[in-house]
Curated annotation (Swiss-Prot):
GO terms for biological process: tRNA methylation. The keyword Manganese does not apply. It comes from Shewanella sediminis (strain HAW-EB3). PROSITE patterns: SAM_MT_RNA_M5U, TRMA_1, TRMA_2. The keyword Nucleus does not apply. Keywords: Methyltransferase, S-adenosyl-L-methionine, Transferase, tRNA processing. Its EC number is 2.1.1.-, 2.1.1.35. Belongs to the class I-like SAM-binding methyltransferase superfamily. RNA M5U methyltransferase family. TrmA subfamily. This is tRNA/tmRNA (uracil-C(5))-methyltransferase. NCBIfam families: trmA_only. GO terms for molecular function: rRNA binding; tRNA (uracil(54)-C5)-methyltransferase activity, S-adenosyl methionine-dependent; tRNA binding. Dual-specificity methyltransferase that catalyzes the formation of 5-methyluridine at position 54 (m5U54) in all tRNAs, and that of position 341 (m5U341) in tmRNA (transfer-mRNA).
Amino acid sequence: MNLAAMDPNTYDAQLEEKRIKLEQIFTDFDTPKLEVFSSEPAHYRMRAEFRIWHDGEDMYYYMFDKALDSKVRCDQFLPASELINKVMPALMEELRPNPTLRHRLFQIDFLSTLSGEILVSLLYHKQLDAQWEIEAKALKEKLAATFNINIIGRARKQKLIIDKDFVIESLTVNNEQLQYHQIENSFTQPNGKVSVKMLEWAIDVTKNSQGDLLELYCGNGNFSIALAQNFDRVLATELAKPSVESAQYNIKINKIDNLQIIRMSAEDFTDAMAKKRTFRRLEGIDLDSYNCNTIFVDPPRAGMDPDTVKLVQGYDRIVYISCNPNTLIDNLAELSKTHKITRFALFDQFPYTDHMESGVFLERR
């Protein structure tokens, strides 16, 4: 991470560079005007990870700065949420003088929410015992006087939870509240306010939809829960078990009654739709009963494999969220043969970095 590049005074300029770069990448495609959704210039990351450096009696957070090729002390961290920045010194003040909690501590992870909850994970190169648990409970009790906080201790093949291993995020999307169960050590959108803009964009491009929605790679249901209002039914797939459990939880707390989550990979689901194989996980689910005219995909950085691209091409309307414009371009080379891009967006999830989150909405030619 290049810490020197994180200067709010340069935010607008770096976003403009991304806009120009993304438009250049898409030169070979007929795209509408690029919609650009900016981030807060500071305190935008809802999660952060720090290594811990021990220096005699002192102990502090640090990160490795690639530009300097060295570690940099981080008593505060500009990109992290204001809540993380408030908890960082308060936590360290309690850890430094506590031999049980500081011994062989090598990393601290923070997961915060816009709604004011924070989860702190303490990672150790030692096994955690009953004394550690006593001290950690006392630590939580002291910090809980100021913060809505929970603590996790992690070591090899060990996880101790005090008292929860998740947070509940509450997002205001088009003036409505959506709640999301976010579990420790699983994927969540890092930039909370930009995530809201992404949800609102996806709702907008799919308004006035007919029929049902299929979503691949649904994670904790982040998009499918928000989009359920636009469709008769939603069928979503996700492979990671913790994410599926969170998605089921989120369906309940948001009182969504038209969303079905299936735990399976996009590749396996592609085989199931093509009737190449049968899967026990699909027992009781009549895929043929769904009338999916729209498909939503948010694949990993590697993009979609050729078979999944072929599956996606079978739908009249495609919403594609991408964290890697290069693999998006690769997939669009095939998708654009049958579909045209009618909406095009840049979401600045990761300010001051080269990463670009983009979205395209395609309709059959």
